[in-house]
């Protein structure tokens, strides 16, 4: 992965616990600033479902040997420079940073077959340049009814677009045809972004 140093070290990335959507926005911003030619090959990926109960393994916040946690949603960054080369940058995983797509999906999401339907994972994949323009959050979802913070916010100002003050729900929503980007089931997500060298060779013959 030595040629994929979009982010030389995880320590060089902006990170605040429980603000994954902003952490990924900052990664997109960093690529636009330092490697603009790669921005068109990058994506922000939201993971959620209708009930907002998605199990993920190998997470720093997880419990037990498998480090499993159930999030209402999660967001990670993806770099897809070649048809058979896709890397995942997840600031909350215990896997390497970055991790090859197939390894990340296999260890983080495993399979929906052993899960109840209400725990099946869906993925909203948004081009990085679109995410930079359209994402907006005033962080209201991280406040209690009395106005106090559930988790301390980032020190920088809220990320606000020119047209909206808070559209996080549009990104978490997994209804096809609503919100930016494209929505996939787990199997569709894998089919779209995992192309092994063997499969590519067959397609080219």
UniProtKB/Swiss-Prot annotation:
Reactions catalysed: N-terminal L-glutaminyl-[protein] + H2O = N-terminal L-glutamyl-[protein] + NH4(+)
GO molecular function, one term: protein-N-terminal asparagine amidohydrolase activity
Keywords: Hydrolase
Catalytic activity, EC: 3.5.1.122
Residues the record marks as active site: 20, 74, 90
Entry annotated with the keyword Lipid biosynthesis: no
GO cellular component: cytosol; nucleus
Superkingdom as given in the UniProt entry: Eukaryota
Subunit structure comment from the entry: Monomer.
Similarity comment text for this entry: Belongs to the NTAQ1 family.
Function: Mediates the side-chain deamidation of N-terminal glutamine residues to glutamate, an important step in N-end rule pathway of protein degradation. Conversion of the resulting N-terminal glutamine to glutamate renders the protein susceptible to arginylation, polyubiquitination and degradation as specified by the N-end rule. Does not act on substrates with internal or C-terminal glutamine and does not act on non-glutamine residues in any position.
Protein's recorded name: Protein N-terminal glutamine amidohydrolase
The organism of origin for this protein: Drosophila grimshawi (Hawaiian fruit fly)
